[in-house]
From Swiss-Prot:
CDD domains: M14_CPA. Substrate binds at H179, S180, R181, E182, R237, N254, R255, S307, Y308, Y358. GO terms for molecular function: metallocarboxypeptidase activity; zinc ion binding. The active site is at E380. The gene is Cpa1. InterPro entries: CPA_M14_CPD, M14A-like_propep, M14A_act_pep, Peptidase_M14. Transmembrane segments: none annotated. Residues 17-110 form a propeptide. This is Carboxypeptidase A1. Residues 1-16 form the signal peptide. It comes from Mus musculus.
């Protein structure tokens, strides 16, 4: 094992990729608040370099954490000493990354049309942006591309607009990939874009939606982070901005919105995966959406898509006070989840962010809801932790297909219940 580790580290140095040989993902089961607090203490020990995939929220909710090889025994000993049970969900993270790379390398042929594009594999930013351009070229009467800004590192932030005409019509916003390592979301976003062009004029529900509203789809919401996951660190979550006074890079773009910014549910530590940034909208990736939504002024539904955990969430994240539209949002979430489950039997839970998972301040949909966008939802796609952020490419299309049924339900309701 030691020889393998040395070889892997040398290869990583040559190719620039961070190595995860021997890293394990543990599922921790905290049975009471005291055990949850112990895990939180573990989380604060930065020298352990733990990467929490599912945070310690409250007793009874699973906690998933990636543990580097050098600290795995210390972490297990800590848990065992405090009688906190755990199981190994992923034995070796690098082996899954190697499988992922091998699968991607087998499908590297450049598509000359969106029909030839491979929707059952993961793609780079350049490939996704080329796909977007192809889609616009093939469907100029339905699809256009808008650049709403540029990233910290200077990449374009592109959004697809699906419209049957008119100006400033009521609209629906969908974004995927705000957390860069959640690859199944960007892949699903690509599939959604193609699905819209295939179904308009053929499928009555989508046709009625687009005859009444525009759809904006941002497939890669965090381009810098996404490129970094491909070139350097597959597990990168945040943006790539620099924080003055810290060597740690990036901000959690789902804690950077001007909705209870700085309250519990986000971190002030620049090295944390949930670092909120120095001020609201500090990240250009967030500010670009804020400016677009504000200037548009007629967005009626806002749907932000993440992975993993199989959840459909609505406001609030920062307070347990029920949202004014909680009853309607809850019923709509139930209908959307029912539609999703009907295809492949995938089970989703639904509810407000704070009641269903944890307290989160500065989140996307708390801000959009505060701007009067009633139908504000966050999805957490497959799975529930068996593979986590490393979902096999074979699950991309089934994930996108079932999620689309939930999206259709929300969009159809939005059209039929104007406000």
């Amino acid at each position: 094992m030691k020889r393998l580790l040395v070889l892997s580290v040398l290869l990583a140095a040559v190719f620039g990729n961070e190595n995860f040989v021997g890293h394990q993902v543990l599922r921790i089961s905290a049975t009471d608040e005291a055990q949850v607090q112990k895990v939180r203490e573990l989380e604060e020990l930065e020298h352990l370099k733990l990467d929490f995939w599912r945070d310690p929220a409250r007793a009874g909710l699973p906690i998933d954490v990636r543990v580097p090889f050098p600290t795995i025994q210390s972490v297990k000993a800590f848990l065992e000493y405090h009688d906190i049970s755990y199981e190994i969900m992923i034995e070796d993270v690098q082996s899954l990354l190697d499988e992922e790379k091998q699968q991607m390398s087998a499908f590297q042929a450049r598509a000359l049309s969106t029909d030839a594009f491979n929707y059952a594999t993961y793609h780079t930013l350049d490939e996704i942006y080329e796909f977007m351009d192809l889609l616009v070229t093939e469907h100029p009467q339905l699809v256009s591309k808008i650049q709403i800004g540029s990233t910290f590192e200077g990449r374009p932030i592109n959004v697809l607009k699906f419209s049957t005409g008119g100006t400033n019509r009521p609209a629906i916003w969908i974004d995927t990939g705000i957390h860069s390592r959640e690859w199944v979301t960007q892949a699903s976003g690509v599939w959604f874009a193609k699905k819209i062009t295939k179904d308009y004029g053929q499928e009555p529900t989508l046709t009625a939606i687009l005859d009444n509203m525009d759809i904006f789809l941002e497939i890669v919401t965090n381009p810098d982070g996404f490129v970094y996951t491909h070139k350097t660190n597959r597990m990168w979550r945040k943006t790539r901005s620099h924080t003055e006074g810290s060597l740690c890079v990036g901000v959690d773009p789902n804690r950077n919105w001007d909705a209870a910014f700085g309250m519990p549910g986000a971190s002030s530590n620049p090295c944390s995966e949930t670092y909120r940034g120095k001020f609201p909208n500090s990240e250009v990736e967030v500010k670009s959406i804020v400016d677009f939504v504000t200037s548009h002024g007629n967005i009626k539904a806002f749907i932000s898509i993440h992975s993993y955990s199989q959840l459909l969430l609505y406001p609030y994240g920062y307070t347990s006070e029920p949202a004014p539209d909680k009853e309607e949002l809850d019923q709509l979430a139930k209908s959307a989840v029912t539609a999703l489950t009907s295809l492949h039997g995938t089970k989703f839970k639904y509810g407000s962010i704070i009641d269903t998972i944890y307290q989160a301040s500065g989140s996307t949909i708390d801000w959009t809801y505060s701007q009067g966008i009633k139908y504000s939802f966050t999805f957490e796609l497959r799975d529930t932790g068996l593979r986590g952020f490393l979902l096999p490419a074979s699950q991309i299309i089934p994930t996108a297909e079932e999620t689309w049924l939930a999206l259709l339900t929300i969009m159809d309701h939005t059209v039929k219940h104007p406000y």
